[in-house]
């Protein structure tokens, strides 16, 4: 065997394309093939232009070899590939126009002409028999053709599939003719209404006999994995691997889906707004008409001197409409179906889910605050009961201190000394009293305003110093003694008795009040928001600098 044949056998056969490199053979390079050997070989020496799987077909090999021998030896072709003859059927002008107009979009689809013009429903022998009987029984329906019958059946099928997709679960709930007849108006086939009213009982009977499923079986379009399925007539010529969905494709699809949803929502909103505005306009027109009628009624009443109530001239208050629950419509019992479960099987009853009212956040927070206040009040009441027989002397006692009645008669005596008096008068006591009382001596102590022996913290205000006071000097006591509390009472036999006790220490300022106020006189708290931002290029700043320059020039001169 020559080297050409060896290379041809080693070459893997592929599909011939535009960019395929084809070798050129001269007549002297082509070997003389034996017919029997060429029929027995499985792979041709020259590219045949067909797929590799089909090259082994017997009849195809015969046709290829016959054509090759006709080229090489000049003999006539005896075997040809059978093809149908082309002839004019006379209906091309019906579907294809001579004056072709370029469409606005380049969207193409794979539907045939019949699929575009004719309905998907196809009549079977039962439909043909019924349609012939119907035409014979009612001659007025003889004008309708089989195509019209298919359109009616297709319309019924589409409407029931759209409105009742789960009809197979309960066939007794099939829609009546009054609800299906409206679809003929939308599809612009009103001329088929007489035929539809006669065909509806037949279609309803066939649909129920099918168990609620479509009357016409659909073509099963699935994967070609089940090659042994006898019901699949046409299989794909070659199996291609399904393209894997990439992430970018999924994102693009998701964006387009959301865009379409938003556009549909916008369209629905616009339609609802248009309907609302129409209703508002109609309401305004009705109100205006009512107003004109009322004006006419008022004029007639005045003319005829009719004294009646003005109920017709005032709009009555609208009461809220109470929606009454509609009475359940009795439905016929569905046909009894044989259950696949045994006789002992009992379905579980459905659970009644209790619907609870929706709680608001404000209500929950107010309830929590109320519960907290109740718990706090209970704790305070409990603590008050525990501290009932005790006295709390802290600054912020939890319980109120009740002063005993005898202790309320004590009076404070606050002595002070003056530098202008003699040394003997230093030992004498004098009290500024806000209320008149009987003195014990001429310069002796007097009774001041009532104070409790347990609450002497307010005496700090009466002991405040002032730099303007003439008594302020070196002889003044900066740290006065604790005031003496005295109480006058009458004992047995009319004796006058004076009880004396020391009060609690008085908390005083370490420095006079005036000095404390002077310390904070010029103190200004700093705040970042109070910062004043100066603009050097403002008119005020420029005028200020100009005035400084004039002053400097004046001083130099």
Curated annotation (Swiss-Prot):
Where is it predominantly found?
A: nucleus
Q: Where is the composition biased (Pro residues)?
A: 327-337
Q: Which GO terms describe its molecular function?
A: protein-macromolecule adaptor activity
Region (Disordered): which ranges?
323-349, 424-449
Start-end of Low complexity biased regions:
429-441
According to its record, what are the GO cellular component terms?
NuA4 histone acetyltransferase complex; nucleus; piccolo histone acetyltransferase complex
Query: Keywords in UniProt for this one?
Result: Cell cycle, DNA damage, DNA repair, Nucleus, Transcription, Transcription regulation
Where is this gene product found? Nucleus
Keyword Transcription carried by entry = yes
User: What is this protein's function per UniProt?
Assistant: Component of the NuA4 histone acetyltransferase complex which is involved in transcriptional activation of selected genes principally by acetylation of nucleosomal histone H4 and H2A. The NuA4 complex is also involved in DNA repair. Involved in gene silencing by neighboring heterochromatin, blockage of the silencing spreading along the chromosome, and required for cell cycle progression through G2/M.
Can you tell me which family this protein belongs to? Belongs to the enhancer of polycomb family.
Protein name per the record: Enhancer of polycomb-like protein 1
Organism the protein comes from:
Schizosaccharomyces pombe (strain 972 / ATCC 24843) (Fission yeast)
From the broadest rank down, the organism's phylogenetic lineage runs: Eukaryota, Fungi, Dikarya, Ascomycota, Taphrinomycotina
